[in-house]
């Protein structure tokens, strides 16, 4: 052990001993000191600023709780060594992978007894994206940001097929949930476009998995909320990247007509169609004041008051058509053909044209504006729901025209998806209907705003929305779920619960991983540690 390593080890030992004395941890000193002795190519840190940086998330809804230490890995084996230490200790301690910290309810937290693995690429020498143009895929580190995956694949004229609206999220983070945006109706979520994974299980094994190898783990990890393993590598399917995007928004005053048009657009299999279908709700004139307003400009103003509506709610359909510079005349004709089939308010067409990369990265530009006004790092009591098609009209009446009370405090997305684009073998949960909607209430709380913008008001409104769905027997499923009890989790997973629990017992029997999800009890104290641990290491 060289001088630098010795210094780091002593610092870590000192910090751990201080914590033992100060808070009376359940984990024994001899077990904790093993953390500092783990031989990794990356590094551990207990620096106060590093601990603080991983103790909160984008949601800012939980009181910060600093972990024992943070691991900055440089390889999957670094992650595996830490997890093997946790798994083999007399008293197992939590290990949580953290990507870009974009969770809402502390899902990536490890607690004061645990260690956070900082997966975000760039801190240490983790592998760079490796594009295979001939085979149309890219291999990426689990902590790579999607925006960097995009930049790398575009060098080869390629891009992933399915996206999220915001690109500053990690690959492992979105694949542990699903990863959805307006392309999901056609390509499915991001988890439907994965060819292969390397995963560090809760036993510290590095396992390669795909449709052909370790299939049960492969499907379990996709949408598995980090419960069975930490994704260290993903092989993502690619397609030829377009150069430009025709971006169109149109308004509706009738919810029925709005949803009929959306459902028509996602049903056009094998036909001329738009490449992206989303939508959002306008319950006040906040459309031009939220982070999705970058589409509009003084040259393309939105005069909501000039559009008549029956009541206070309008609906905006958002669609795009991808194309190459050489196809500009063709795209005009295609858009005209597609638009003729829709029944929007004729005077409400807003169109812009931009580079493909600029469209995909549109939310980040709005983020920079909000950051400049100190409006980004505020509490985000987001609520994301999958609503079955058969009950979306009831949801509109009860929530959009009812509970929300003509105030948004942020964007409200609504768009349909096709269930047959989701692999039922994954751990992701969707309603039991062939078409279902995402309804995403992406609100921000302000301490010095109106009462309807305060955190407690918005949290109470979320509670009322969930209560309304339960009382009205609208079988919604939470996306990016957060539940308080295991009974609620059992209800959430439904028919998938038995398999989910079985996977946990097989791949993380001591409940070490992703304890911040609060699905299972904290790391098992009753299971005696194994006498030895094996590792079927995979490399790439």
Swiss-Prot record:
Reaction equations catalysed: N(6)-dimethylallyladenine + A + H2O = 3-methyl-2-butenal + adenine + AH2
EC id: 1.5.99.12
Reported tissue expression: Expressed in the developing leaf petioles and in the rib zone of the axillary shoot meristems. In roots, expressed in the vascular cylinder within the root apical meristem and only faintly detectable in the differentiated root.
Compartment annotation: Secreted, Extracellular space
Binding site for FAD: 97, 99, 101, 103, 107, 165, 170, 176, 180, 231, 479, 517
Short name of one Pfam family: Cytokin-bind
GO BP annotations listed: cytokinin catabolic process
Gene Ontology MF: a single term: cytokinin dehydrogenase activity
Residues with PTM Pros-8alpha-FAD histidine: 102
GO cellular component terms, semicolon-separated: extracellular region
Signal peptide stretch: 1-22
The keyword Cytoplasm belongs to this UniProt entry's keyword annotation: no
Keyword field: FAD, Flavoprotein, Glycoprotein, Oxidoreductase, Secreted, Signal
Annotated ranges, domain FAD-binding PCMH-type: 63-241
SUPFAM superfamilies: FAD-binding/transporter-associated domain-like, FAD-linked oxidases, C-terminal domain
Xref: Gene3D superfamilies: 3.30.465.10, FAD-linked oxidases, C-terminal domain (3.40.462.10), Uridine Diphospho-n-acetylenolpyruvylglucosamine Reductase, domain 2 (3.30.43.10)
InterPro entries from the UniProt entry: Cytok_DH_C_sf, Cytokinin_DH_FAD/cytokin-bd, FAD-bd_PCMH, FAD-bd_PCMH-like_sf, FAD-bd_PCMH_sub1, FAD-bd_PCMH_sub2, FAD-linked_Oxase-like_C, FAD-linked_Oxidoreductases_BP
Cofactor(s) required for function per UniProt: FAD
Residues glycosylated per entry: 310, 406
Family to which the UniProt record says this protein belongs: Belongs to the oxygen-dependent FAD-linked oxidoreductase family.
Function (record text): Catalyzes the oxidation of cytokinins, a family of N(6)-substituted adenine derivatives that are plant hormones, where the substituent is an isopentenyl group. In association with CKX3 regulates the activity of the reproductive meristems, flower organ size and ovule formation.
Name the record gives this protein: Cytokinin dehydrogenase 5
